[in-house]
Design a protein with these regions (language model features):
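Interaction-mediating elements
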Residues: 93, 118, 152, 177, ...
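Feature responds to low-complexity, polar/acidic, surface-exposed segments characteristic
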Residues: 65-87, 100-148, 154-175, 181-213, ...
């Protein structure tokens, strides 16, 4: 490439995508969604990525900086021998400070992840603001997840069990995690169009909740969510902290 190239496209959902590629290999992708959400993803020639997302009023929802080289985590976890398949991913997400340990050099990889914890992880990934007010009655001020839940609800990444109840201490299921990941992907400008047929390869794909089919299918199609063996998806199973790390790494 000897000169700057610009391409534009309109997705099926009406989003307008503009991609500017410079001769040095750096790239800027701007996505303007019909609801007014605008994302800009800048990738430098060295592979560092900055993602900025604003809402229809111009308020910044995401200002994420992801280095090409992931730093080593400050803590060397000593309890990852039960989940060797997740060790690399856990160290990556810990290096990015998305997920913390549970104390005394432990990560607790097979412990379940709660809804409040996942909202907090996605908030850290977004590097979004911390001054939103939570509208949920069961999200008290000053809890570790308070800011994360408030941001995630504002950004449309999470929804409550009802309009007033979020259930932050409830464990999250594989299908709930997939839906939240797909919503986050849409927020930052990725094309989240999915084909429900992606679930047909699993013997229990039809056990996926109707509300979750699109999100789960998108995660399956993009290799973020994989089966569990014997061609099962197990969509309603609890998600462990190790599984969350692996899905974030694939994302």
């Amino acid at each position: 490439l000897t000169s700057t190239s610009t391409t534009t496209e309109t997705r099926e959902d009406g989003s307008k995508v503009t991609t500017i590629t410079k001769p040095d290999g750096s790239k800027t992708v701007t996505v303007e969604q019909p609801d007014g959400i605008k994302s800009e993803t800048v990738t430098t020639k060295d592979g560092d990525v900055t993602i900025t997302v604003t809402d229809k009023n111009g308020e910044e929802l995401v200002k994420a900086e992801i280095p090409a080289t992931i730093p080593e985590p400050e803590t060397k976890f000593e309890d990852l021998d039960t989940t060797p398949w997740a060790e690399e991913a856990i160290n990556k997400v810990a290096g990015l400070e998305l997920v913390n340990g549970t104390g005394e050099n432990k990560y607790s990889p097979i412990a379940p992840m709660t809804r409040g914890s996942l909202a907090t992880v996605l908030h850290r990934l977004s590097q979004g603001k911390t001054d939103y007010e939570s509208t949920f009655k069961d999200v008290a001020q000053g809890r570790y997840y308070t800011e994360g839940v408030a941001w995630a609800a504002k950004a449309g990444v999470v929804k409550g069990i009802t309009d007033e109840i979020f259930a932050p201490e409830q464990t999250i299921t594989r299908e709930q995690l997939a839906v939240m990941m797909a919503r986050y992907a849409k927020l930052v400008g990725l094309n989240t169009k999915a084909d429900a047929k992606a679930l047909d390869r699993f013997t229990d794909g039809d056990a996926t909740g109707t509300w979750a089919v699109d999100g789960v299918a998108w995660c399956v199609q993009n290799g973020i969510l994989k089966g569990k063996g014997n061609d099962t998806l197990d969509p309603t199973a609890e998600v462990t902290r190790a599984e969350v790390a692996v899905m974030l790494d694939r994302f």
